[in-house]
């Protein structure tokens, strides 16, 4: 773990016990961020922990630092921080690390575009290499793998600082001493160690099999990284030839794969084709004999009802190939082009010539050429029929995936093992989901898995597989007997280190070795974040006090990736869940509820909105986004949060301006006791909501109470609170004591949401930090008041103010006489605070009448006061 210190030259130590003349929100983030860092306010000290129950451990998602910052980052990470701050105030030792997911394909792509380079592993290392002064992403300079990795490390360091500056500005209470990266030596050690353990138990294996392949990035892709997108295509009706001269017509959107056809498949119950099962036909253009077979996955109502099986056009082809034990006929290479060498199953010269016409071409060009040849040969019936088909894409790619036979590493995840699948489904039921319905997304994903987890990538900046392969006397690698390092040697890099018992000079020669050339998918490392941060196989004491963790926040789009992969790894390695609960955030959309994207021009830069409105305003808006629900972004809403933060400053200054209060026993006035009774209920409601991880509900009740407190209670009692030398000394003391008690409690209730403004006000009159103070409990507040009293007073104030608003006169306008009629219980409450009520409403004569089922006011207004000079 590395420690990074936040420094600033503009922060000044706070002057405690002094209320500023003009409170302001500006500068609070820098001021308090510096102080919190200097005081190590949020640092976790395992030596102070006696038992696991004392700790609240958070598995924070390590953001992909090569990505673009957007409001969704701020919202979801703020949600986590409100929970962390609440748990800290409840007395928990909060273990709240932060990490950066800095390896993998997104980082490589950013480095390529930023520096105008590409990795060519065949090139030697150049210690004096300098990136182009004017990078051109379209003319990338080839560099060695080592040079490329160095640039990845260099750029991620810059990106990581940008993220860290944002998180500090937002006020995340993470422990920056626990900072980690997914490419650090320690993370590599953990990833390689877990892999070796998986391999030893038979949970990780190497297989040469059909693989989803992205031709742009030249790498394998896992099922969890797929996106099904609409893709324009056309159905082509092709005739396959029977020995008797009849044709069997199929319809396909991929005629370029005709040379890879190994069978025709129809449903066993389809009467149209039952007489063909067990016979053979020959393919158009290439004259290759293929069988006609039955399989229940064939769709009778799709196209002609009979389909050609090619290796491989889609995942259905893979299933048919595997279950019907069909031959492999590969014609597409890793670059997405038709293989140059004519396949051995294409025999006659004319067919070979037709294949040579498409050899080396992209699939798009090959499709066009094949269709032209089919038209010329008369083997295509009619014109192509345009259609929109669903195609699998890599989530970060822009071309449909191909399926190519390659050798890859896998980890078992239940995709082909019902017992393991059921065990992982049961883990999902053990897990507490916030909100609960998100569990169904997990279950749907696990139930829909069709293969094991492919974890190898044909890329460069990632965690290497700790594997070498011995070379036989013929120079061929023995993949069945890999060479593995001792755990104590980890981390290792097989590309630059020889295995034990070999010399570097034996690399790549007969009788020597080769290193596994691939790296682990970034999810294979980030799936181990619970183990990385808790000290698994590094710090037994820390691990015992923090694992399994308590809380795993994430967005709903990564349930299939990050949630599931961590459950898999912890189940296999630790025999348990990695954490007790998962909290799912929604997306932040634009005001039209469309997903924000750079290409649409509807993104917002988080630092700009923080600079404009302040961090507390942004945090308020974030907390108003309910768990699991998408939330539209609107800058106008930030103004509401800023207004709340500013009101806390000004109302606090106002309250503290009344002077010192007394003891709780000095609170005797019915209005004061009623307000505190409401506060007591608020504490219970906010606590219950937070205990259910419903931060939005907690904020809503706090804010509702606060505005009523300011608009009604403060206005009602301010004359009495000022009157410390008058006849009602006890009433003034009661008001001032109630005010300070309420302010104390409300600051603590708001602290998880608005950490900067609450800390600022706390420093005016309290020692220490509001964030290390205790969460309020109902026992702190008197329970003798009637909570309905202030509700009735608020209703009366609405009427008294309303009569002035109706007549469009200032609120300072006196009411000569007023009569309030209401039910007896309401009248009794109003009489109890008659003195405060007449003062605040400037009513000279107030009478009450019992009757009716609602409050009714009759009033006579006096002359409006003269306008005050500005």
Curated annotation (Swiss-Prot):
Residues 1-21, 479-505 are annotated as: Disordered. It is an enzyme of class 6 (ligase). A motif ('HIGH' region) lies at residues 63-73. GO terms for molecular function: aminoacyl-tRNA deacylase activity; ATP binding; valine-tRNA ligase activity. Keywords: Aminoacyl-tRNA synthetase, ATP-binding, Cytoplasm, Ligase, Nucleotide-binding, Protein biosynthesis. InterPro entries: aa-tRNA-synth_Ia, Anticodon_Ia_Val, M/V/L/I-tRNA-synth_anticd-bd, Rossmann-like_a/b/a_fold, tRNAsynth_Ia_anticodon-bd, Val/Leu/Ile-tRNA-synth_edit, Valine-tRNA_ligase_type_2, Valyl-tRNA_ligase. Its EC number is 6.1.1.9. SUPFAM superfamilies: Anticodon-binding domain of a subclass of class I aminoacyl-tRNA synthetases, Nucleotidylyl transferase, ValRS/IleRS/LeuRS editing domain. It is found in: Cytoplasm. Pfam families: Anticodon_1, tRNA-synt_1. It catalyses: tRNA(Val) + L-valine + ATP = L-valyl-tRNA(Val) + AMP + diphosphate. GO terms for biological process: valyl-tRNA aminoacylation. Residues 1-13 have a biased composition (Polar residues). It comes from the Bacteria. GO terms for cellular component: cytosol. A motif ('KMSKS' region) lies at residues 595-599. Gene3D superfamilies: HUPs, Isoleucyl-tRNA Synthetase, Domain 1. ATP binds at residue 598. PANTHER family: VALINE--TRNA LIGASE, CHLOROPLASTIC_MITOCHONDRIAL 2, VALYL-TRNA SYNTHETASES. ValRS has two distinct active sites: one for aminoacylation and one for editing. The misactivated threonine is translocated from the active site to the editing site. Catalyzes the attachment of valine to tRNA(Val). As ValRS can inadvertently accommodate and process structurally similar amino acids such as threonine, to avoid such errors, it has a 'posttransfer' editing activity that hydrolyzes mischarged Thr-tRNA(Val) in a tRNA-dependent manner. Monomer. Belongs to the class-I aminoacyl-tRNA synthetase family. ValS type 2 subfamily. This is Valine--tRNA ligase. The lineage of its organism: Bacteria, Bacillati, Actinomycetota, Actinomycetes, Propionibacteriales. The gene is valS.
